[in-house]
């Protein structure tokens, strides 16, 4: 009898959430597994009068352990002509607390702003990310906006762009920005809203038990014509929404193997950006069970169009003459289900080159950190976001217990970045890596800070408008003393952790995706 083998290089991954399915290309090295938890009993007694000492062991299966999975994806933003999205955004949304996906109104999200002419000439040159909550806002309804303001070498603020558009704003409303947020100097800045979005977007949001403390309202991911800002404002809860993952091995077109990871929880995402690579995210998490859908008879593989294919709820249809197009029956009938969204999957224009990545490190505490702003050219880095999930498994005797659900622990945002050891020959406090080390280790200054307060932004892929890129903005960051690494070129590695001043809010960081807006590289969604 012939035996069918399956190869990892023939594999694809699909994610099911809220009656919709997305295709997510993964890299080599993905894994998923599930084992059992066992206990053993051993005998250990002394020798009897007959010279016999009983020795033995008995094993018991206590429970089925939760499934563990991991895979890597590239960071792949794209632009649909009206909205910015990312191939992997479904994973972020579930990790960040969303429980719904659909078309929602994006009215009031800021599309464009104008910066009133700045008369100051004494601001510190640099790029500053400003949260609207730290400004004086002329309106009352808007929330969640973030801007990036640039100060030129003349000490004048001369450029602004929207990082996060927020919600419920109105054109002509203003923000008065304190000088301390834009390099100090003379006078405040005024930012005026030019236009706001009036349409609708395919968004991920929180529907049940919305956390009113979130600065971003119910929205977790709100794509607009400007960008796609993803926040964790709805993630302050003990149990997050889950999704189903499908690993499809297409080695055989007649008998493709499909493993379903039920009730999967996204635990950790680690973003890596080394100088010679493509921006990558390493994902890991848990699931309740791993089910073989092929052996269960729930995989239909043929050339029939899904709209004409009959099936029952939960069955999977793979169209063999259309690159094994994945469809899922959400109810029993003919064509009663959804076909996987594959927007951006086939594009070659949405990969991000790490070599263009920039880091902006700044603080308003110039008494302790004399440079205030540090301009660091990176050679690599990492940001890791973790929900620290543990899976609950009962421990009843006499039963093989089954995993119940994952429970979150403390949310952590940590990472590191590396750069060459550089000294600005023009003098001290010029924002070089040497200045950062000296400021952090100087007694009576940075060394005396139990908790230091930096704002850190990684511009992965650079800052050129229209190019694919990902910004990671962390408003409050505690930075460790840089560690020297002695190699051919001396470098320093700096660890950090983002934190919040208000434990009622999940505001440690915001991710902002920008797709390639070149007309030829736009793709439809969904």
Question: What are the language-model segments listed below?
Answer:
Residues 108-202:
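Conserved, function-critical positions that sit in or immediately flank catalytic
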Residues 1-109, 199-526:
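Signature of extracytoplasmic/envelope-associated structural regions
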């Amino acid at each position: 009898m012939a035996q069918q083998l399956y190869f990892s290089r023939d594999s694809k991954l699909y994610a099911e959430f809220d009656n919709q399915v997305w295709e997510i290309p993964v890299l080599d090295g993905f894994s998923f597994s599930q084992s059992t938890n066992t206990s053993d009993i051993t005998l250990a007694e002394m020798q009897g009068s007959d010279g016999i000492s009983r020795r033995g062991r008995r094993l018991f299966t206590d429970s089925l352990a939760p499934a563990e999975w991991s895979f890597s994806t590239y960071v792949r933003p794209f632009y649909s002509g009206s909205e910015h999205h990312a191939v992997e955004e479904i994973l972020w949304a579930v990790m960040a607390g969303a429980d719904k996906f659909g078309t929602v109104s994006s009215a009031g999200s800021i599309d464009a702003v104008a910066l009133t002419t700045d008369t100051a000439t004494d601001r510190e040159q640099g790029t500053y990310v400003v949260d609207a909550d730290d400004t004086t806002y002329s309106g009352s309804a808007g929330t969640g906006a973030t801007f990036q303001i640039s100060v030129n070498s003349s000490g004048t603020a001369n450029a602004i762009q929207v990082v996060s558009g927020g919600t419920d704003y109105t054109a002509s409303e203003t923000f008065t920005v304190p000088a301390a947020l834009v390099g100090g100097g003379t006078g405040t800045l005024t930012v005026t809203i030019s236009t706001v979005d009036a349409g609708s977007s395919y968004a991920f949001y929180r529907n049940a038990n919305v956390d009113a403390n979130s600065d971003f309202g119910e929205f977790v991911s709100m794509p607009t014509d400007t960008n796609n800002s993803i926040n964790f404002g709805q993630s302050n809860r003990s149990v997050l929404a889950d999704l189903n993952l499908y690993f499809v091995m297409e080695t055989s077109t007649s008998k493709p193997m499909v493993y379903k990871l039920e009730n999967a929880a996204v635990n950790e995402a680690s973003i890596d950006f080394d100088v010679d690579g493509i921006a990558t995210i390493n994902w890991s998490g848990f699931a309740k069970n791993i089910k073989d859908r092929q052996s269960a008879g729930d995989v239909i593989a043929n050339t029939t169009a899904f709209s004409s294919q009959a099936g029952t709820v939960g069955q999977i249809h793979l169209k063999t003459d259309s690159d094994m197009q994945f469809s899922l029956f959400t109810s029993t009938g003919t064509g009663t289900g959804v076909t996987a969204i594959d927007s951006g999957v086939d594009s070659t224009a949405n990969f991000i080159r790490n070599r263009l990545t920039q880091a902006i490190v700044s603080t308003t505490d110039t008494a302790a950190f004399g440079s205030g702003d540090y301009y660091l050219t990176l050679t690599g880095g990492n940001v890791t976001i973790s929900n620290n999930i543990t899976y609950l498994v009962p421990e009843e005797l006499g039963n093989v217990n089954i995993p119940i659900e994952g429970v979150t622990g403390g949310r952590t945002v940590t990472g590191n970045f590396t750069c060459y050891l550089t000294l600005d020959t023009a003098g001290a406090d010029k924002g070089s890596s040497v200045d950062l080390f000296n400021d952090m280790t100087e007694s009576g200054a940075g060394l005396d800070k139990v908790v230091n307060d930096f704002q850190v932004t990684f511009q992965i892929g650079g800052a050129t408008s229209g190019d694919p890129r990902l910004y990671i903005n962390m408003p409050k960051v505690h930075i460790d003393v840089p560690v020297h690494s002695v190699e051919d070129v001396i470098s320093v590695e700096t660890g950090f952790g983002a934190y919040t001043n208000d434990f009622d809010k999940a505001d440690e960081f915001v991710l902002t995706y920008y797709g390639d807006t070149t007309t030829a590289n736009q793709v439809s969604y969904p």
